[in-house]
Amino acid sequence: MRILHFYRTAFPDTMGGIEQVIHQLALGASQSGIEVDVLSLSSDKQIKSIEFNGYWTHRAHLDFQLASTGFSLSVIRQFSRLAKKADVIHYHFPWPFMDVVHFVTGVKKPTIVTYHSDIIRQKELLFIYRPLMNRFLGSVDRIVATSPNYRATSQVMVRYSDKTSVIPIGLDKATYPKPSQDRMKYWSERLGGKFFLFIGVIRY
């Protein structure tokens, strides 16, 4: 089996939450004997496909970015080529240009969308994008919500509840960076023996 993940950014170019999810899925699948390709955009001038921790990452040149949406003409051809070899295509939402690529290339493979987030900041542009978004989400085979609460409260996902499944994001603890004992002692003395630290990409 061969899986193609498609999103606007990915390791090793950028380090964020969705990138980490894609990496963990690709890593886990490759360790189970599944061939995995990850396709994303990059502003790097030296673009080439590289093997990364057991799976292949492919990058197309980022032509320009508008309202957090990356655009690339060359990615259309790359996606078409990789999609022909794939058994399953795994999209990561939201990325409006991804929807365009999906329809332009005429994908005929089983398709999954992991729905990571509603569109929050670009609500004015959502009015323009909504018809394409609904057509895209309506065309894929399955949608994955990352929590039961998200599936129940997202106005977009409620519309597609009949083909939405909940699969919580799982992370391999073995890949966590190990904190130094000095730093752990420092924070334990200030916060107590047990505490949570949440870190993510600061986008808004």
Where on the chain are the PLM-derived regions?
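Carbohydrate-associated surface elements
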Residues: 42, 149, 170
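Short hydrophobic "strand-cap" motifs at the C-terminus of beta-strands
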Residues: 6, 146, 167, 198-200
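N-terminal strand-loop element at the rim of the active site
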Residues: 6-15, 21-70
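An aromatic- and histidine-rich active-site surface loop
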Residues: 74-76, 88-108, 120
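A short beta-strand/loop micro-motif in the catalytic core of glycosyltransferases
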Residues: 89, 138-148, 165-167
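Acidic anion/phosphate-binding donor-loop and adjacent secondary structure
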Residues: 155, 170-187
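Conserved donor-binding/catalytic core segment of Leloir-type glycosyltransferases
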Residues: 4, 184-204
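A short, histidine- and acid-enriched strand-loop-helix "catalytic/donor-clamping" loop
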Residues: 67, 96-97, 111-126, 139-142
